[in-house]
């Protein structure tokens, strides 16, 4: 088996999203020996779709079992015993995967017909152990060109060295636009955090730092569906806590795997951005019932791991003067930060019709 594509699904029986995703994977150009890549290689790039239902309460699993029955040998329907969120569903897929390459997709996204052919060809011809591409951001189910997002940069590619690892720590980019050699995953015992949102904030950098050769296809081959009505776009305190936990797990993994010291400055920035700054402002914007005690917990966490994060050169460059001013105020007093932020937001809404 050349490729295993792992796709978690949860409560996807309605709206046709599951079907659109699955059909895009079933209609890949590889798997029948007739693609240009397969003819050139003299072999069939056979692939399997590991469709994992994350203990849905609707008919998602029933639909996946029907796909399995209709496409034996191509689709394998799996189900988690309890809801483990995306990381747990992916881990179940990994445990059952047989492909030389492993790819991931989110259940409400889809792939261009030649996505996996092009990624595999790039990996097979270069000897890379991870291959990525760019993506489309779309708001409807279509194969038309959307907003193109250029993901990883070409200066991150090739045989990886310390400078490239630093760039990948700073910007690993999404895992769903990549395929990974299963041998690298197995050798490094790579998995995903379970039972939480933002699992990629931990897994993404760790997986990239565990690889030795990264290549990229400079084409948007993945369609990322942005449904603003989806609950995944709503901010809750639990999601903020999950983001914080993902940051803590990233630091733990880097310590255990020997990445902490050589990439300390980059890790400090990644933690400051993902754990602290993103959480601070999304919490203040999106959570309805805010607590000073949460702001205190967030402050304790960043100061415990990286007390001098505000001196980080990447931090100084990434964030604007107002963001850094607000963070400094938070470091002085969570209460003062809260009062000032609320007053600033109210003022802007009143006089300018905006709010951070």
Task: Please state what every model-predicted region is.
Residues 80-97, 104, 118:
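Glycine-rich, basic loop-to-helix element that forms the pyrophosphate-binding segment
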Residues 11-38:
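Short, well-formed alpha-helical segments that are part of the catalytic scaffolds
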Residues 110-215, 225-235:
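Donor-binding/catalytic cores of nucleotide-activated saccharide
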Residues 2-6, 48, 202:
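Cell-envelope/extracellular polymer assembly enzymes that use nucleotide-activated donors
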Residues 29, 33-55, 76-80, 107:
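Short beta-strand/loop segment that forms part of the nucleotide-sugar
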Residues 286-356:
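Membrane-interface aromatic/basic loop that binds lipid-linked glycans or pyrophosphate carriers
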Residues 195-196, 204, 213-246, 260, ...:
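Nucleotide-sugar-dependent glycosyltransferase catalytic core
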Residues 24, 53-62, 82:
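A conserved acidic beta->alpha catalytic loop
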């Amino acid at each position: 088996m050349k490729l295993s594509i792992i796709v978690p699904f949860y409560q996807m029986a309605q709206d046709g999203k599951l079907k659109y995703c699955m059909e895009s994977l079933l209609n890949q150009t590889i798997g029948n020996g007739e693609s240009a890549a397969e003819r050139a290689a003299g072999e069939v790039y056979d692939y399997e779709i590991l469709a994992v239902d994350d203990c849905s309460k609707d008919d998602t699993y029933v639909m996946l079992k029907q796909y399995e029955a209709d496409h034996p040998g191509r689709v394998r329907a799996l189900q988690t015993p309890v809801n483990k969120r995306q990381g747990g569903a992916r881990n179940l897929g990994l445990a059952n995967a047989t492909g030389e390459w492993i790819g991931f997709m989110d259940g409400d996204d889809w792939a261009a017909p030649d996505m996996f052919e092009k990624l595999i060809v790039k990996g097979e011809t270069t000897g890379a152990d991870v291959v990525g591409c760019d993506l489309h951001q779309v708001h409807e189910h279509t194969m038309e060109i959307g907003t193109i997002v250029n993901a990883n940069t070409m200066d991150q590619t090739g045989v990886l060295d310390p400078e490239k690892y630093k760039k990948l720590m700073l910007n690993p980019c999404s895992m769903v636009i990549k395929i990974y050699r299963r041998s690298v995953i197995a050798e490094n015992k790579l998995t995903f955090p379970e039972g939480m949102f933002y699992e990629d904030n931990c897994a993404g950098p760790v997986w990239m730092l565990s690889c030795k050769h990264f290549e990229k296809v400079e084409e948007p081959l993945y369609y990322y569906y942005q449904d603003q009505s989806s609950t995944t776009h709503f901010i809750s305190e639990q999601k903020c806590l999950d983001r914080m936990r993902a940051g803590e797990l990233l630091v733990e993994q880097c310590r255990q795997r020997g990445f902490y010291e050589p990439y300390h400055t980059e890790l400090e920035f990644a933690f400051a951005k993902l754990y602290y700054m993103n959480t601070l402002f999304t919490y203040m914007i999106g959570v309805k019932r805010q607590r000073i005690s949460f702001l205190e917990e967030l402050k304790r966490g960043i100061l415990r791991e990286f007390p001098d994060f505000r001196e980080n050169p990447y931090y100084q460059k990434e964030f604007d003067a107002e963001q850094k001013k607000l963070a400094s105020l938070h470091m002085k007093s969570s209460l003062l930060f809260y009062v000032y932020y609320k007053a600033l937001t109210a003022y802007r809404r009143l006089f300018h019709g905006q709010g951070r």
